[in-house]
Amino acid sequence: MTPRLGTPVAPLWLCLALTLPCAPVFCADAGPLVISVPQGFDGPIESEENGGMTIAWVKRRPASDGGTSLQISAIDVGPSLDAIAPSERIQAASHYLMEFLKGLGQQLGHFEFGEFTQATLAGLPAARVRWTGAVAGHATIGIMYCVLIGHSVVSLQTQDIGSEVTPQMYSALGAIEGVRVR
């Protein structure tokens, strides 16, 4: 229960609320999804082309050009997804995840990925994979998901420089795993 402002408890409640730690998070629409963007991720950076959209945020590292990215891409493929039975949606998500990986692999050197695993995003079956590669000679790591929502194929990803998942990536993964359908 929240105290009403006219009660003697209200000033005490307000003082207490102001002393609690707060991690500013904001919600953003990303195609058919809503995501709670973690604290410190700047953006969005948006682009639209060929019936698809991409939106991304970056948590920059001090004294560095790089940072951790959080990216969502959605492609409207029309009613073709309507014919996919619920029991086949994880297979379809895995198929499209492989297509997204092929595109990513063309941009990276030494590209490798692990086994696909099943996940649930916004209550829907999703495919997930961890990958590694190199950008300009620097090791890069990422985790990518794919989920089918309505008429959209949606890819969600976080990546960073290095060979291990970073704390910033874990923050982005929490946001990805907490998405909601709009």
Predicted region positions:
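Soluble non-cytosolic domains of exported or imported proteins
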Residues: 32, 87, 91, 95, ...
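Surface-exposed amphipathic alpha-helical segments
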Residues: 38-43, 153-182
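N-terminal "mature-domain start" segment
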Residues: 25-58
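A short, solvent-exposed beta-edge/loop patch
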Residues: 143-153
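N-terminal secretory signal peptides that target proteins for export/translocation
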Residues: 1-7
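Bacterial N-terminal signal peptides
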Residues: 10-21
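Conserved polar/disulfide-associated segments of primarily extracytoplasmic proteins
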Residues: 50-142
